[in-house]
Design a protein with these regions (language model features):
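Secreted/periplasmic carbohydrate-active enzymes, especially glycoside hydrolases
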Residues: 1-343, 347-351, 396, 411-412, ...
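Substrate-binding/catalytic cleft of secreted carbohydrate-active enzymes
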Residues: 204-206, 318-320, 328-595, 604-605
Length: 608
């Protein structure tokens, strides 16, 4: 099997053609397309951009809220000179599931809307001709998938998604599509692990191929080769190594080759950063130096294109994070596009990488019910659907780690977001996931999950598995919000005193906290939803953080306003953004800029 999640690269032995652009598109509410032959001829004149979500491109509500099967179609040309190579189609993501057809022949199926998959079509394509590519996608939700939810049928017969999570269920081909010509024998994967030495650094590597020929690995600093080795496992010794660091990213070029005599059978290139990351004595250590995490939970979300990859938006987001003094973000609540990790590698940002395990609390208003204990069912991990859910969870976790393990920016894995974890089935569900993450990652990054409001130090059955504890807390908003901030602060301290007793030397970070603020809403004296209240809440919350030495990071919710399912508690989406959805600063952005640009990088490096 030639499964590979390596990012597509053009090299001396590999060829790429991007298939992004305007495709044809059709809804298939009756799921009749396969039998009707739509894989060969899509009966639609609709055009649709790829990558993008389809939802916000329409002006009618039925199209925006469509739930069910839908089709994409395009054509691609295979040059005659590609004959003799493996021809592979590669999708960055299709949300949430896909069946892929080439010239009417089904070549792939994939479940999960946030990670890549490919299909070898060598024996299907016609050379020196155009070939038809069709994708049957589906965006229905269920309790066996990540993220979790359900699908219900309206009185008029239309399906509608009912997510258990608080972000909009955008759908479509969200990331780039590539046509690749690859050598028959090729590099399938590689992994690295770093050690710092008195004279530089050592890089232990492993390379996976699908053939018998020898492998060489070289490391370049610009045009200068600084280390080399041979074999599918080995060590690169780098003298006077330049380390990758926060806002001072230094990247080397890694060159992996397969040789047959004097000929190069395959060549794969990537960029890596030499750095170590660990937890020691309750501190996060980057290159053996303490680092206090500051930044955001985010979403892949923007006007019009929805969750589709948009590089100008990505660029703007990183510029704003640099301006405000952030050094870290969580990929809430799913793995992001690979291009975002590449930019984090280049800009020197830290990433907590999160698998799309969200909505594991049965509620159609998860953001409120989960935090107030009103979920309709507490035992989410004791259901008939649990075995299938766990299987899909393991598959997504495996793909995420395989895809992202070589990024220097990735410092930790988040295995779940706000699961219901106070019932008996929690430990049986959590244990194999945390063990799998440890086994798969050659760098043994720390593992965590985000703890919702109703999971307290003495009730959470999952926190013992985490290498560091990540809390989502909203004292002063969902809990004791309004004029009684003093009560919120007292309750917050009471809970934190409880966590101090169960951490056992582990650090704790906040992966969510915040209030909604309608941009431009001012009120004196303050009221909830105003800029003044948001700032008062943040000042109170930060004072609590600063009181506890074991708090080692703060990732506010959210970087920018984002779209959600409509409802009486959401004013055209979630307004907790420090920036607007159009990426302009709210008043709170200046509060964070003052705080984060003055806090030392090793804030709280010594125990009190």
């Amino acid at each position: 099997m030639n499964r590979s999640l390596l990012y597509p690269r053009a090299t001396t032995t590999r060829r790429l053609i991007g298939l992004d652009g305007m495709w044809r598109f059709s809804f298939d509410p009756e799921s009749k397309g396969v039998e009707a032959g739509w894989a060969l001829d899509l009966p639609s004149s609709l055009s649709m951009p790829v990558p993008a979500s389809f939802c916000d491109l329409f002006t009618d509500k039925a199209s925006r809220e469509y739930c069910g099967d839908f089709w994409y179609e395009t054509s691609f040309f295979v040059p005659a000179e590609w004959s003799g190579w493996d021809i592979v189609l590669r999708f960055g993501s299709v949300t949430h599931r896909a069946r892929v057809f080439v010239n009417g022949v089904e070549v792939a199926q994939h479940e999960g809307g946030f990670l890549p998959f490919d299909a070898t079509v060598t024996n299907i394509v016609r050379y020196n001709q155009f070939n038809k590519l069709s994708v049957l996608a589906n965006n229905e939700l269920s309790e066996t998938m990540l993220p979790a939810g359900t699908t219900r049928t309206l009185a008029d017969g239309r399906k509608i998604a009912a997510p258990y999570f608080d972000f909009y269920n955008y759908a479509g081909i969200h990331r780039p599509v590539w046509l690749m010509a690859l050598p028959k024998e090729r590099v399938l994967d590689y992994s690295t692990r770093y050690r710092l030495t008195e004279t530089g650094a050592e890089i232990d590597y492993t390379v996976s191929t699908n053939g018998p020929h020898p492998v060489t690995v070289e490391l370049y600093d610009g045009t200068t080769r600084v280390a080399e080795s041979s074999g599918t496992t080995g060590t690169l010794v780098v003298k006077n190594a330049k380390l990758w660091n926060i806002h001072a990213a230094y990247l080397y070029d890694l060159v992996i080759r397969i040789h047959e005599g004097s000929a190069v059978v395959d060549e794969y290139l990537d960029r890596i950063g030499i750095r170590t990351f660990e937890i020691r004595h309750g501190r996060f250590l980057l290159n053996v130096s303490p680092v206090y995490l500051r930044g955001f939970g985010r979403h892949e979300d923007a006007d019009i294109r929805g969750r589709g990859l948009d590089l100008p938006t990505v660029k703007r987001d990183f510029e704003l994070m640099k301006w405000i003094g952030a050094n870290c973000f969580r990929t809430s609540h799913y793995p992001y596009a690979e291009e975002i990790y590449q930019m984090a590698d280049e800009e020197g940002f830290l990433i907590i990488d999160e698998v799309p395990a969200v909505g594991f609390m049965q509620s159609t208003a998860n953001f409120l019910a989960a935090n107030q204990g009103n979920g309709r069912q507490q035992g989410f991990f004791e259901k008939e659907t649990t075995p299938a859910l766990l299987k899909n969870h393991k598959a997504a976790l495996t793909d995420m780690i395989d895809r992202d393990k070589n990024h220097p920016s990735v410092i930790a894995w988040s295995l779940l977001n706000e699961p219901q974890c106070t019932s008996a089935g929690t430990e049986e569900y959590f244990k194999p996931l945390f063990e799998l993450a440890r086994r798969l990652d050659p760098q043994k990054r720390p593992r965590t999950y985000t703890v919702l409001m109703t999971s307290l130090p003495d009730t959470s059955k999952g926190q013992r598995f985490a290498d560091f504890v990540s809390l989502n807390r909203y004292y002063g908003w969902y809990v004791l919000g309004g004029a009684g901030l003093a009560d919120a602060e007292a309750a917050f301290h009471h809970e934190m005193d409880g966590w101090a007793k169960v951490l056992h030397g582990r650090p704790l970070i906040f992966t969510e906290y915040g209030t909604d603020n309608l941009s431009g809403a001012h009120k004196l004296p303050s009221v909830m939803w105003s800029a003044e209240y948001q700032n008062e809440y943040l000042e109170m919350t930060h004072a609590v953080f600063d009181h506890y030495d074991f708090v080692q990071g703060e990732l506010v919710w959210n970087f920018a306003d984002f779209q959600t399912t409509e409802g009486i508690l959401r004013v055209d989406g979630n307004k907790k953004g420090i920036f607007t959805r159009q990426r302009q600063p709210k008043d709170a952005a200046y509060l964070f800029r003052k705080r984060w640009t003055t806090l030392p990088i090793d804030f709280k490096k010594r125990k009190k």
